[in-house]
Amino acid sequence: MAVLDILTIPDERLKRKAQPVKDIEAIQGFIDDLIETMYHTDDGIGLASTQVGSTDAVIVIDLSETRDQPLVLVNPEIVEKSGEYVGEEGCLSIPGYRAKVTRFEKVKVTALDRQGKAIEIETDDFLAIVLQHEIDHLHGKVFIEHLSTLKQQIALKKVRKYA
């Protein structure tokens, strides 16, 4: 396994949209690297493939206290959403910056697990927020795009200072 470099704004590769994975067997090593990279961070609870420069549609999430229960989702899609929730978010691609973001309170996501089995997750807790955040990355969006232009500029300035 290898720790991959995490892209930070304003890297244009973060705007690329992920493509559906057709051969899950071929990306098993990459999935391991993505998990290892997430665990290598101090506080990362999720990571999308596009954050490390890949266009394979894969996200990994681990909300466990022990950080040893990764959830791997290949080709995830939000198929239902409802309600509204406002909460503070941060991002490994925007180090040192946090802001309040409005998200859906409840989501239903369909995906494949790392063995290629179809799964469905319906949640209205913190996982719902993390799923939306990571799936946004697969669509070429970072969370600050949900903010005003001024707040986006502040985030960019903080990242440049942090680098």
Swiss-Prot record:
<feature type="binding site">
    <location>
        <position position="91"/>
    </location>
    <ligand>
        <name>Fe cation</name>
    </ligand>
</feature>
<dbReference type="GO" id="GO:0043686">
    <property type="term" value="P:co-translational protein modification"/>
</dbReference>
<dbReference type="InterPro" id="IPR036821">
    <property type="entry name" value="Peptide_deformylase_sf"/>
</dbReference>
<dbReference type="GO" id="GO:0046872">
    <property type="term" value="F:metal ion binding"/>
</dbReference>
<keyword id="KW-0479">Metal-binding</keyword>
<comment type="similarity">
    <text>Belongs to the polypeptide deformylase family.</text>
</comment>
<dbReference type="InterPro" id="IPR023635">
    <property type="entry name" value="Peptide_deformylase"/>
</dbReference>
<keyword id="KW-0648">Protein biosynthesis</keyword>
<feature type="active site">
    <location>
        <position position="134"/>
    </location>
</feature>
<dbReference type="GO" id="GO:0042586">
    <property type="term" value="F:peptide deformylase activity"/>
</dbReference>
<dbReference type="Pfam" id="PF01327">
    <property type="entry name" value="Pep_deformylase"/>
</dbReference>
<dbReference type="GO" id="GO:0006412">
    <property type="term" value="P:translation"/>
</dbReference>
<keyword id="KW-0378">Hydrolase</keyword>
<protein>
    <recommendedName>
        <fullName>Peptide deformylase 3</fullName>
        <ecNumber>3.5.1.88</ecNumber>
    </recommendedName>
</protein>
<comment type="function">
    <text>Removes the formyl group from the N-terminal Met of newly synthesized proteins. Requires at least a dipeptide for an efficient rate of reaction. N-terminal L-methionine is a prerequisite for activity but the enzyme has broad specificity at other positions.</text>
</comment>
<keyword id="KW-0408">Iron</keyword>
<feature type="binding site">
    <location>
        <position position="137"/>
    </location>
    <ligand>
        <name>Fe cation</name>
    </ligand>
</feature>
<feature type="binding site">
    <location>
        <position position="133"/>
    </location>
    <ligand>
        <name>Fe cation</name>
    </ligand>
</feature>
